[in-house]
Amino acid sequence: MTIAYQEGEQQVLLNGENDNAFIRTEEVSMMTSNTSKYPAVREKLLYLQRELAAANNVIMDGRDIGTCVLPDAELKIYLTASASERAKRRYLEQKERGVESDLAQIERDIIARDEQDMNREIAPLKQAEDAIYLDTSDMTIEEVVTKIVSLVQKA
């Protein structure tokens, strides 16, 4: 796995192939949750994420970035939305890519992943004490971006 920057955007390359679309699929999302409970996997990823952050200005998203990976980050935002809204967004993303999916199943999967991640032994999903809570359930993507840019400018 390699992380590269192409045309100003971060790309995740697996065996030299750009797999950004693949890593955002529901299947990978669930596999991520299942494999993140293994200490050796978490340790390696923790090292890689911290190495990336030390060498670059980064914006990272993830379920334990503010509490475990980068606990001293300059700005931490606990970005959330209701399970139904996240399911709707994922459904629309998949539809745009031509992927058939079931909205109700996506929501069930999101709820199951949340439960699993909140209750895992190692680095459970939780808001960092110094993170800004931002519920985006009733916000458009443009509103979310505007809010985050405002928070960055204030930091």
Where are these regions (language model features)?
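N-terminal phosphate/diphosphate-binding loop that engages ATP/GTP or pyrophosphate donors
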Residues: 1-27
